[in-house]
Amino acid sequence: MNRNPDQNTFPNITLKIIETYLGRVPSVNEYHMLKLQARNIQKITVFNKDIFVSLVKKNKKRFFSDVDTSASEIKDRILSYFSKQTQTYNIGKLFTIIELQSVLVTTYTDILGVLTIKAPNVISSKISYNVTSMEELARDMLNSMNVAVIDKAKVMGRHNVSSLVKNVNKLMEEYLRRHNKSCICYGSYSLYLINPNIRYGDIDILQTNSRTFLIDLAFLIKFITGNNIILSKIPYLRNYMVIKDENDNHIIDSFNIRQDTMNVVPKIFIDNIYIVDPTFQLLNMIKMFSQIDRLEDLSKDPEKFNARMATMLEYVRYTHGIVFDGKRNNMPMKCIIDENNRIVTVTTKDYFSFKKCLVYLDENVLSSDILDLNADTSCDFESVTNSVYLIHDNIMYTYFSNTILLSDKGKVHEISARGLCAHILLYQMLTSGEYKQCLSDLLNSMMNRDKIPIYSHTERDKKPGRHGFINIEKDIIVF
C-alpha cells in the first residue's frame, strides 16, 4: 500500500526537505528511497537559480552568441529542469534527476561558470618552426606506407558532426587555459598551436574529471539550444565518453585519466595551454599506422596526414636535434609473430636493458599471464597507451590494441614492426627512460622505403561490455 507518511512517522527535517523538493508530501516508498539523498536534495533546494541563470546567459553570450535563443527561453529551460522532479513519480528517474542536478549545483560554477570572468594574461610561448623543410620528407615517409587497398563495397560508419562544434571549440580553448592542470589536448588542434596551417575539427582532450565536465557542458548546450543531449560511453574505448545531440551528431568527446597518469604524460606549454608533447604524438601516429583502418584513412586524405607529420618531424628535429640521414642501425627491431597464440616477440637488447618484449594481442591473456608471474609492478597508462606494461626478469610484457600487418605468411610488415617499436618507446617516455637514440633510428628507418603490399592482418582484440549512456531528457543513466 502506497500511503503518504505523516509527520509523526518520520523525522520532521528529512521529511520537510523531501517534501519541499518534490512539491508534494512523499509517499512511504519515496521517503524511504530518498531519505539518504536528503543532503544532496537540500543543496539543490537552496541552490541560487538566479545566479546560475546569469552564468549560463554569460556563457551563451561569450561562446554561443550566434545561437538564436532568448534570455527568457534560457531561464525557462533552467527553471523547468530544476522543477522536473515535481512531475516525476518513478523512483529511478528521481534518482537520475537528483544525481544530475547535484552535479550542476556543486560543479558548474567552478568548471564552466569560471570561464565568464576575466582570464589571466596569456603567456606567449610559441617557437617558430620551419615546417616547410619537413614536408617533402613527411610525404616520402607516408607514401611508402600508403599501401591499403580500399574495399569500395565496405560500408563505412558516418561520423556526423554537429554545427555546434565551432562554438564548443571556442569554449574549449578557454577551458584548456583555465583548467590546464586537469585538462590537456592532443591531435590536430594541438598541432595547430605549433603550425597555424593545420586544419582541425573538434578538439581532442584528456582530463581527470571528464564525466563531470561533459555533464555540465551537456546541460549548458541543452539550456541554450533546447535540444536533447545524450552522453555515450563506448565499451572498447577505455574511459571514453562522447556528447551527441538528439540527431546523433557528434559534438565533443573526452578520455578520462587518473591524476597520476596525467602527471607523467609528456607535455609542453603553449599560450597557457598544455598539449601532449608532439614527440609522444608522433610515436602514437607511427603506432596507429599498424591499424589497417588508419592506413585506409591515409589513402583517402594523404595531405592531411602530411601536414601533421611534417609538423611533428620539425618539432623533434628542433627539440631533440634529430638528424635525418637515413642511418637506421637496428630499426625497426626484429619482430616474430606467433599467430596461434597471438603474441609478437620484439628483440630489444640492442636498445634497452630488457632483452625482449612480449607483445600480446589479447588483453585478457596478458592479464592472466601477469597474474601467473606473481608480479605487482605493472604500469597502467590507461587510454594514453591503451595498455599496461610490465618488466619482469629482463622481459617486457605489454598489450597492443591495433592490428598487426603481415607482408607475407608469418612475417610482420615493417609498418607494424615500427608501430611496435613506437609502442615500447611510449613507455620509455612515460617513465623518463632513454629513448632519443632509438627515436632517431626509428624515424630514419622510415626514409627511402619502397611500398610493401599487405599480405594480411590480424584481427583486433574483441572488447566485451555494453554501451552506456546518459539521456537527460528521459532521465536515464545506464553505465
Swiss-Prot record:
Q: Where is the active site?
A: D202, D204
Q: Tell me what turns on expression of this protein.
A: Expressed in the early phase of the viral replicative cycle.
Is Transcription given among the entry's keywords? yes
Which EC number(s) does the record attach to this protein? Answer: 2.7.7.19
Gene3D superfamilies, per database record: Poxvirus poly(A) polymerase, N domain (1.20.1270.320), Poxvirus poly(A) polymerase, nucleotidyltransferase domain (3.30.460.60)
Q: Which UniProt keywords apply?
A: ATP-binding, Calcium, Early protein, Metal-binding, mRNA processing, Nucleotide-binding, Transcription, Transferase
Q: Name one GO molecular function term.
A: ATP binding
Q: Name one Pfam family in it.
A: Pox_polyA_pol_C
Q: Which reaction does it catalyse?
A: RNA(n) + ATP = RNA(n)-3'-adenine ribonucleotide + diphosphate
Task: For this entry, list what GO says about its biological process.
Answer: mRNA processing
This molecule's function is given as: Polymerase that creates the 3'-poly(A) tail of mRNA's.
* Similarity-based family: Belongs to the poxviridae poly(A) polymerase catalytic subunit family.
What's the protein here called? Poly(A) polymerase catalytic subunit
List the source organism: Vaccinia virus (strain Ankara) (VACV)
> Which gene carries the instructions for this protein?
OPG063
